[in-house]
Amino acid sequence: MAKKIQAYIKLQVKAGQANPSPPVGPALGQHGVNIMEFCKAFNARTQGQEPGLPTPVIITVYSDRSFTFETKSTPAAVLLKKAAGITSGSARPNTQKVGTVTRAQLEEIAKAKQADLTAAEMEAAVRTIAGSARSMGLNVEGV
């Protein structure tokens, strides 16, 4: 018989830097999950990623206090800010542009995000990422 699911927990944790402090500790502690076990497993799984990049994770907690988790790719906004060399998007994206991204940068981000995007083709994924860039106040070259 399958284990009964008690909760789903969605968090964004920096790759390779999970520790028991907030937000990880309180979110897992209230469900009775072994926090250090999660931190060690998460850090091991995100070891190949660039340290410090926020990584979305969905933790499934079962009624016997065991858990499984699934990591997603880094949010597109974070990758776009890194590619454009800015710290935050524009407060007025339609009138005030804060940076520029090229087609090559968009393709690189789309490749990294393709598993999490619903786009069937690479061109559609690039257009999706370009739309995110425009909504952040970035100029998009070549699309």
Curated annotation (Swiss-Prot):
<dbReference type="InterPro" id="IPR020783">
    <property type="entry name" value="Ribosomal_uL11_C"/>
</dbReference>
<dbReference type="InterPro" id="IPR020784">
    <property type="entry name" value="Ribosomal_uL11_N"/>
</dbReference>
<comment type="similarity">
    <text>Belongs to the universal ribosomal protein uL11 family.</text>
</comment>
<dbReference type="Pfam" id="PF03946">
    <property type="entry name" value="Ribosomal_L11_N"/>
</dbReference>
<dbReference type="InterPro" id="IPR000911">
    <property type="entry name" value="Ribosomal_uL11"/>
</dbReference>
<dbReference type="GO" id="GO:0022625">
    <property type="term" value="C:cytosolic large ribosomal subunit"/>
</dbReference>
<dbReference type="InterPro" id="IPR006519">
    <property type="entry name" value="Ribosomal_uL11_bac-typ"/>
</dbReference>
<dbReference type="Pfam" id="PF00298">
    <property type="entry name" value="Ribosomal_L11"/>
</dbReference>
<dbReference type="GO" id="GO:0003735">
    <property type="term" value="F:structural constituent of ribosome"/>
</dbReference>
<dbReference type="InterPro" id="IPR036769">
    <property type="entry name" value="Ribosomal_uL11_C_sf"/>
</dbReference>
<dbReference type="InterPro" id="IPR020785">
    <property type="entry name" value="Ribosomal_uL11_CS"/>
</dbReference>
<keyword id="KW-0687">Ribonucleoprotein</keyword>
<comment type="subunit">
    <text>Part of the ribosomal stalk of the 50S ribosomal subunit. Interacts with L10 and the large rRNA to form the base of the stalk. L10 forms an elongated spine to which L12 dimers bind in a sequential fashion forming a multimeric L10(L12)X complex.</text>
</comment>
<dbReference type="GO" id="GO:0070180">
    <property type="term" value="F:large ribosomal subunit rRNA binding"/>
</dbReference>
<protein>
    <recommendedName>
        <fullName>Large ribosomal subunit protein uL11</fullName>
    </recommendedName>
</protein>
<dbReference type="InterPro" id="IPR036796">
    <property type="entry name" value="Ribosomal_uL11_N_sf"/>
</dbReference>
<keyword id="KW-0689">Ribosomal protein</keyword>
<comment type="function">
    <text>Forms part of the ribosomal stalk which helps the ribosome interact with GTP-bound translation factors.</text>
</comment>
<keyword id="KW-0694">RNA-binding</keyword>
<keyword id="KW-0699">rRNA-binding</keyword>
<dbReference type="GO" id="GO:0006412">
    <property type="term" value="P:translation"/>
</dbReference>
<keyword id="KW-0488">Methylation</keyword>
